[in-house]
Amino acid sequence: MGTVPANPFKIIQLAFKETVPKAHAELQKWHQEALKIEDVEIREQAAWTVNDKTFHCEGGSIFALLAGENKDNHIQFLVAYQTICDYLDTLCDKNDAHDPNDFRSIHQALLDCLTPDKPYGDYYQYRDRFEDNGYLRKLVDACREATASFPGFADMQTHMQEVSQFYIDFQVYKHVEEEKREPLLKDFYERNKHFAPTMRWYEFACGTASTLALYCMAAYAAAPVQTAQGQQIKEAYFTWVQGVHILLDYFIDQEEDRQENEMNFVAYYRDSKEMFERFKYIDEKATEKLQMLPDKKFHLLLKTGLYALYLSDKKVMSHPRLKAEAKQLIKLGGFPASLFYYNRWIFKRKIS
C-alpha cells in the first residue's frame, strides 16, 4: 500500500491529479447511462441528479487515497453508491405519496450493493408503471463488481451494512408526511441513543445521514494491506464525523429551508451561541475518536476540510449572517481548513 498523505498540500495535489478526475469520468459514464432511460421524467431526474450532485462524489473520492493501488475500484464503488443515494433522494423528494414502504423498497438497492450473493430487490414494487430501463440495477452491479476486488470486504461487510441501514432509516423518516417526521426521528434516536447518548435527537439524525463512514470502510477494505477495523472506523465516523458533516450541510441550507418551510436541524439551536458550542463539542468528540485510527492525520485533515468545502459555498457567501457565522465555524478547522477553503475551486467542475 502506498503512503497515505498526511499534509493538506499533498491531499489537494493528489485530489486534483488523481481522485477527482477519476470521479468525473465515472460520473460522466452514469450521466450517459441516465440519458438512455426512455421515460422522459425519470430520465430528466436521473440525469439532473448526476449533474447537480457532483460535489458529493468529488469530495468522497479523496478516501480513495487510503485504497493504495486499488483506487480506481474504490472510486467506481463510491460514485455508483453515491449516485444511487442522490437518485433515490430525488425520487423521494418528487413523490407526493410519502409512502415509507416505497422509500424502503427503493433503498433496498443500497443494501443489495453490499450483498453481492443476494437477488435484486423489487425496488419499484410500490410505483405504478415505473421503468428506468435497468438504470438502478446497473448501479448496484457496479458496486458489486467493485467490492469483489476488495481484499478486506468480508471483514468490513457487516459494519458497512449497519451504517447503510442507518442511512436508509433516516431517509425514510425524512421523507414521510411532514407532521410525522419529528416524532419518527425522535423515536429513532431513543432506540439508538446508546451509540451517542450525549447527542441530541436532531444531531444524531445528522450523524446517520452521511455516507462518509461507509466510504472510509470501503477504502480500507479495498487496500491490498488491511490496516483498520470496521468497528474502529464506525466509532469515529458514525456518528461524530458524520454529525459534523451533515450539520454543516444544514448550516448552509438554513435560509433556503426557511423560505421553503423545510425541516432544518441547525434551526433547532436556540441561537448562534448554542450552535457554536454544540458544533465545538461534536467536533471535539470527532477529533478524539479519529486520533485512534491508523492514518489519523489524514482523517483529521479530511474533517477540517469539511468546514472549508461547505463554508465556502455560495449560499454562505451571499448571506451576511451566515457569512459572519461561517468565519467563526471555520476556526474549528484551523489552518488546514483555511487552505482547503482557498482551494475550493478544484471541486467546481460540472459534468455534461
Swiss-Prot record:
InterPro entries: YtpB-like
Domain of life: Bacteria
Enzyme class: lyase
Keyword annotations of the record: Lyase
Gene Ontology molecular function, alphabetical: lyase activity
EC number(s) given by UniProt: 4.2.3.188
Catalytic activity: (2E,6E,10E,14E)-geranylfarnesyl diphosphate = beta-geranylfarnesene + diphosphate; all-trans-hexaprenyl diphosphate = beta-hexaprene + diphosphate; all-trans-heptaprenyl diphosphate = beta-heptaprene + diphosphate
Pfam families membership: DUF2600 (PF10776)
Similarity comment: Belongs to the large terpene synthase family.
Function, as annotated: Catalyzes the conversion of geranylfarnesyl diphosphate (GFPP) and hexaprenyl diphosphate (HexPP) into beta-geranylfarnesene and beta-hexaprene, respectively. Also produces beta-heptaprene from heptaprenyl diphosphate (HepPP) as a minor product.
Official protein name in the record: Trifunctional sesterterpene/triterpene/sesquarterpene synthase
The species this protein was found in: Shouchella clausii (Alkalihalobacillus clausii)
